[in-house]
Regions:
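Primarily NTPase-proximal linker/entry elements flanking Walker-type ATP/GTP-binding cores
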Residues: 1-89, 96-99, 110-111, 115-117, ...
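G-domain G4 guanine-recognition motif of GTPases
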Residues: 8, 65, 95-99, 146-148, ...
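Short, flexible helix-loop junctions that flank or precede catalytic/ligand sites
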Residues: 44, 48-51, 179, 186, ...
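Switch II (G3) loop of P-loop NTPases
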Residues: 63-66, 92-103, 110-128, 132-160
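Residues at the starts of beta-strands that form the adenosine-phosphate
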Residues: 89-92, 172
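Short, glycine/polar-rich helix-capping loops at beta-to-alpha or helix-loop-helix junctions
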Residues: 103-106, 213
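Conserved C-terminal guanine-recognition region of P-loop GTPase G domains, centered on the G4
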Residues: 111-113, 128-136, 153-225
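Short hydrophobic/aromatic-enriched beta-strand-loop microsegments
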Residues: 116-120, 223-228
């Protein structure tokens, strides 16, 4: 069953070793018990990030490959804190650092308009710090959308890293990936985006796949936590 759900062989071995160590022979013959125990252990390996607003303003930056749903996720996070939709409203602002994708600016500006929150663009190196400072300390949360970068496009990743130079500030950076990404690509993506010192991972498009063993296996192997689903 774990193979059918695309768990890695090393992850499966870890679970099997745990079964042999912690369950009796009689226990191993009880399928329902074994299944419950395996599910519990899988749950224990999934690390959940502790999301707290540590500073004011708290700057949240989403990075990741093209087409993973960063802009939509930015809107969802903004709505979570938005005075209209939240039980604990905060003052939220958006920054857009995606000036490459056609329609990207219009899309995020539409979200900002629907949520009635301010938005500004990061157009060149140095803009990031200036725009964050322009919002001032009366802002609680600043969420930054960025251009999608293939994990193999080292030049574009380097450009985005310069564009997001925070001059000593410590934004919360989240790597955004889809649940449908194959395991080998996940490992490469996790590695190539380390340049951003991301805090944890946001997983998107869970509703578009029936198997997430690859995701659980890779995140466990690389010791990465999940911030949002």
């Amino acid at each position: 069953l774990m193979e059918d759900n695309e768990f890695s062989q090393s992850y499966i071995k870890k679970i099997l070793d745990k079964l042999k160590k912690e369950l009796t022979i009689d226990d191993l013959e009880d399928f329902d018990l074994v299944q419950k125990q395996v599910v519990d252990w899988i749950g224990e390996t999934i690390k959940i990030a502790d999301i707290k607003l540590k500073t004011r303003p708290q700057v949240i930056v989403l990075v990741g490959p093209t087409g993973v749903g960063k802009t939509t996720t930015v809107a969802k996070i903004a709505a979570r804190y938005n005075p209209i939709a939240s039980d604990h409203p905060l003052r939220v602002c958006l920054l857009n650092a995606d000036n490459y994708r056609i329609g990207a600016k219009d899309q995020i500006e539409t979200y900002a308009s629907l949520l009635s929150i301010p938005i500004a663009s990061i157009d060149k190196d140095g803009d990031f710090v200036n725009k964050v400072n322009s919002y001032g300390t009366d802002t609680d949360v600043i969420i930054v959308d960025t251009l999608g970068c293939s994990h193999k496009d080292y030049e574009k990743i380097a450009v985005l890293r310069r564009r997001l130079d925070s001059k000593g500030a410590m934004p919360e950076v989240y790597l955004t990936m889809t649940a449908m990404t194959k395991a080998s690509d996940m490992k490469e993506i996790l590695q190539q985006f380390e340049i951003f010192s991301y805090n944890s991972v946001i997983v998107t498009k869970l509703d578009e796949t029936g198997c997430i063993g690859n995701l659980i296996s890779v995140l466990d192997e690389k010791n990465k936590s999940i911030a949002y689903l």
